[in-house]
C-alpha cells in the first residue's frame, strides 16, 4: 500500500490544526458555566454531554494528518480519565496551549529537543509545587464540595457521594446504576454481598418480598456440584438436631439433592437455602475462600483433602443474618477470626499493588471492599433517558474526583492552583531554548483559568491578571462571578486530577513538538459502480 508523507512545517501545521479542532470542541464544556455538546449517535437519540473525554472520543477527522493530531490529544484526555477519573477538559486545554506556543517557537528556529527538556523540567517543578499547596480532605463537607464541582455544580450529587463514602469508607465499593424512578437515591449494603440468588423459589421465607431470611445460620461452602443426597446426609442430620438454619453455597445443587432439600424445607424439617457460588474459575476459588474466612468456615474441596460426607459442624461458617433474593446474597456480621480476616485483607491489598491489569485490579478492589467496608449503590434517576445518561456520566466523574481527593488531597479550584505555581517557575534558572520551554509551560498554566472565565462570559485575561496579583486560594468563582477565597467557597479540585492533567498534556505535546515527518496511507478513490448489463431491450431482463 502506497503512503503519503509530509515534512517539517507542513507536518506540524497539520498536527496543530487537528489539535485545535478537537480542543475547541472540548474546551467549551469547562467550568460551572461551560456549555453542552450534542453528539449524534448511529442508533437512538443524540447524546448531550458536558464531559470532555466523551466529546473527545467521538471526534474523528477526515484529513488523515489532522486526525493524527486530534487522536494524540484524545489520548491525553483518555489517559487522564483512566488515571484520575476527571480533569479531561483541563488536560486537553493544557495540551493545546503547550503545542500551539511550542510550534510557533520551532517555526522561528528554536531547537525542539531543548524545548522538550525545558517543558519536562518546568512540569516537574509545578508537580512538586502542587504537592506543597495540597491539603488533605478534612471532613465529609469537603468531599461533598469536590463531588459538587466535578458534577457541574450539582450539590445533590456531591452530597450523595460524600454520604456513600462516609458509610462504606475509602476502600468501599460505590457503584452507579440507572434508577427506574425519577429520584437519585443511595442504598448501602452492609456485609458481604455477591450476585447469586436462591437456586429454587421454594426456599423463600417471605413470599411478599420473595426473599429468604436466615437468622444465626450455619454455612456450608462446597467447591463442586452437589447432586447426590447421601454425601449431604451426615451433616444435614447434625444440623436438623440443632434446629439452626443452613445456607449451602456450591457450584450447583441439582437432581436428588435439590429435590430432598426442597421437600424438607416445605415440610419444616429443615430451614435451608442453596445458592450457586459467585465468580468463575480461579476467581471463584478466591471468593469462596473470602466467604470462608469472613464466616469462620472451611471450603469443602478435594484439593484440601476434605470430603463432603466427612464434614463436621466445625467446618461450617456462621453469621448473624443472611438475606437472599432472586439475584443477590448478603451475609451480615460473619463470625470469622479477626486476625485471619486482617491477614486476608493484607494479601488482597498486596495483589492490588502488584497487578498490571485494570480489570483484575477492579475485581480485587471489589473483593477488598466486601471484606472491610460494604457496598454503596447510587441509583441515578431522571425524567428522560437522555437526561439520565448525562446525569449518570456526571455522577461517575464526581465519584472518581472524590476518590482522587481522598487519595492525594485538594488544591484551590478554578485553575488557581496552576497560577500559584508560576512563582516557583520564576525561580528556576534555565538557559537558551530550555528557558523558552519553561516559558511555554508558564503561558499554558494560565489557560484553564482564562477558559473558565471566558465560558462564564468574562474577559479571561483581565480575570487571570487579577488572580495572579493576589495569593493563596484567592480566585474567581465563575458560578457567582465573584472574587473570593475558593477553598472557603467550596471551589476545590483533587490534587491528583490537577497533577495528572498537566503531566499527560506535557508528555504528548512535547512529543508532537519533536515531530519532523508524518506518514499516512493514501486515501482510496471510490471507483464508480459497474455498468449495467448491455444489449437487453427495456423490460427484457430475466423473470
From Swiss-Prot:
<dbReference type="GO" id="GO:0005524">
    <property type="term" value="F:ATP binding"/>
</dbReference>
<keyword id="KW-0547">Nucleotide-binding</keyword>
<feature type="binding site">
    <location>
        <position position="414"/>
    </location>
    <ligand>
        <name>ATP</name>
    </ligand>
</feature>
<dbReference type="GO" id="GO:0140662">
    <property type="term" value="F:ATP-dependent protein folding chaperone"/>
</dbReference>
<protein>
    <recommendedName>
        <fullName>Chaperonin GroEL 1</fullName>
        <ecNumber>5.6.1.7</ecNumber>
    </recommendedName>
</protein>
<feature type="compositionally biased region" description="Gly residues">
    <location>
        <begin position="531"/>
        <end position="543"/>
    </location>
</feature>
<dbReference type="InterPro" id="IPR001844">
    <property type="entry name" value="Cpn60/GroEL"/>
</dbReference>
<dbReference type="InterPro" id="IPR027413">
    <property type="entry name" value="GROEL-like_equatorial_sf"/>
</dbReference>
<dbReference type="GO" id="GO:0051082">
    <property type="term" value="F:unfolded protein binding"/>
</dbReference>
<comment type="subunit">
    <text>Forms a cylinder of 14 subunits composed of two heptameric rings stacked back-to-back. Interacts with the co-chaperonin GroES.</text>
</comment>
<feature type="region of interest" description="Disordered">
    <location>
        <begin position="524"/>
        <end position="543"/>
    </location>
</feature>
<feature type="binding site">
    <location>
        <begin position="29"/>
        <end position="32"/>
    </location>
    <ligand>
        <name>ATP</name>
    </ligand>
</feature>
<dbReference type="GO" id="GO:0016853">
    <property type="term" value="F:isomerase activity"/>
</dbReference>
<dbReference type="InterPro" id="IPR027409">
    <property type="entry name" value="GroEL-like_apical_dom_sf"/>
</dbReference>
<dbReference type="InterPro" id="IPR018370">
    <property type="entry name" value="Chaperonin_Cpn60_CS"/>
</dbReference>
<keyword id="KW-0067">ATP-binding</keyword>
<keyword id="KW-0143">Chaperone</keyword>
<feature type="binding site">
    <location>
        <position position="50"/>
    </location>
    <ligand>
        <name>ATP</name>
    </ligand>
</feature>
<dbReference type="Pfam" id="PF00118">
    <property type="entry name" value="Cpn60_TCP1"/>
</dbReference>
<keyword id="KW-0963">Cytoplasm</keyword>
<keyword id="KW-0413">Isomerase</keyword>
<comment type="similarity">
    <text>Belongs to the chaperonin (HSP60) family.</text>
</comment>
<dbReference type="InterPro" id="IPR027410">
    <property type="entry name" value="TCP-1-like_intermed_sf"/>
</dbReference>
<comment type="function">
    <text>Together with its co-chaperonin GroES, plays an essential role in assisting protein folding. The GroEL-GroES system forms a nano-cage that allows encapsulation of the non-native substrate proteins and provides a physical environment optimized to promote and accelerate protein folding.</text>
</comment>
<dbReference type="InterPro" id="IPR002423">
    <property type="entry name" value="Cpn60/GroEL/TCP-1"/>
</dbReference>
<dbReference type="GO" id="GO:0042026">
    <property type="term" value="P:protein refolding"/>
</dbReference>
<feature type="binding site">
    <location>
        <begin position="86"/>
        <end position="90"/>
    </location>
    <ligand>
        <name>ATP</name>
    </ligand>
</feature>
<feature type="binding site">
    <location>
        <position position="493"/>
    </location>
    <ligand>
        <name>ATP</name>
    </ligand>
</feature>
<dbReference type="GO" id="GO:0005737">
    <property type="term" value="C:cytoplasm"/>
</dbReference>
